[in-house]
Amino acid sequence: MACVQTDFFDAIAPPLPAGCVLTHEFLSAEEEHALLAVLRALPFEAARYKGYTARRRIASYGGRFDYDTNTLRPSPPMPASLAPLRDKVARWLGVEPSRFAHVLVSEYAPGTPLGWHRDVPAFESIVGVCLLGAARMRLRRYPPLHPKAADVLNLALPPRAAYVLTGSARWDWQHSIAPTEALRYSVTLRTRRGDALPLPPAGPAMLEPSTLSDTRMRASR
């Protein structure tokens, strides 16, 4: 398969919302390769929302939200094979791994979108780790009283990147994922309601609320 490269810095957009941070190359290529083998062995099933079956497949640990009853139902605990990733995220943020109460692994087949939403209120801060394929996250104010395309911020998510949504970015904004061009996986880690995570320390490959927020994604083969 041809290698796909993306240019993430060819357009300047408004700053990211407060509480939103993205870092590139959170995982090394070797870590990504090993983690993909772990993810592909998980028992995925189709995501469902109020009777609708989505194209996205998921594996949920530490609870599964039932959208028909709006309740959090039990699900298996996180498998030990995901502990190295959880621990790496915890070190990045300077927190104890036990603060992550929920892990959701999602598989996006080519062309799979994720609609506008805020994450369920049972959880607080969100950390996402991106693998294999690139994606575009869109963010807009919540509630969107008079939604316009010009009000949407677009954030390119390259493979091996990680992002944080906490505080205002978590509660005052919605996000969605544009239809993906290639197979991708994401691992989302969440804390319990009321347990807000700190932002990670600044680094050279990090986009922060006061800096560049989005880019057009160009694929070159």
Predicted features along the sequence, with ranges:
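Non-heme Fe(II) oxygenase metal-center motifs and adjacent flexible, charged/small-residue loops
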Residues: 1-221
